[in-house]
Amino acid sequence: MEKGFDKSAIQMVIITGLSGAGKSQAIRALEDLGFFCVDNLPPNLLPKFGELIVHSKGKINKIALVIDIRGGEFFDSLSDGLHQLGAQGIRCEILFLEASDEVLIRRYKESRRRHPLSGDARIFDSIQLERQMLADLRGRADKVIDTSDLSARQLKNQVFELFGKDARHSQLRITIVSFGYKYGTPRDADLLMDVRFLPNPFYEPALRNLTGNDEPVQEYVLSSPTTKVFMRKYYSLLRFLLPHYTKEGKSHLVVGIGCTGGKHRSVTLANRLAAALVDEDYAITVKHRDIDKDRGGGESA
């Protein structure tokens, strides 16, 4: 090996997860970012592949691999392969993609493809089996993306945010997601906060059709004494937690803030929290998941 070659400069991403969750789209996004990509690499070839990367002496330093479920030996061979890569001085990030049962079933019906574990079983049963087989691997993942509500373009954008040229320079990247409990909680959230106890702009006729991006709604929510106390305490809690997440090696944290419909209170607080955390030198992304849903419909604050 040439003197001066720094193996810590190697960025290897292993893409795995549920069949039908979008692994092919994810690796195409990484290819657009300049990664050397290999689809469907058998896990037992990981150590040999690592040797080839090291012997390239830095000519290939951004690598993305898709590794799919491959029967009962999948976990043993992958775990051993990751261990051997670590012994070679190569650290891998695991990106795990998942989606809800309903979405996966719909995707399979639309594509008319067979699930890799189907055999004679129903698609639903195959999905449940795969979830069980991948449960431990999901727990080891560095990053998890739930693609249930994502278009191909949105998934690509998330991959760009996670692995783009500036992604490695921040000690911790934080995604703050506002959402409505009536639509379910974000499946990839690490922290969830229910703010339905705060004053609800929905019941103010002049504010009902506005959102937390509008100044009148922000003033209504933030002027409440309860909101002021809550924001001070919650911000203090996050300031305590974030350095500990960083110390444990976590690179991406998803914070969910939910109200009833995801349009007023949660949007306001997500924006305000993001503005406060930017001053703490974290890379912040804000997503308002449900802000455009059910406009003019029932209770939606």
Swiss-Prot record:
**What does the sequence similarity comment in the record state about its family?**
Belongs to the RapZ-like family.
Q: Which residues participate in GTP binding?
A: 68-71
What's the protein here called? Nucleotide-binding protein Helmi_06460
Database matches in Pfam families: PapZ_C, RapZ-like_N
Q: Which GO terms describe its molecular function?
A: ATP binding; GTP binding
Report the function annotation for this chain.
Displays ATPase and GTPase activities.
**By its UniProt entry, which NCBIfam families does this protein fall under?**
PRK05416.1
Protein species of origin: Heliobacterium modesticaldum (strain ATCC 51547 / Ice1)
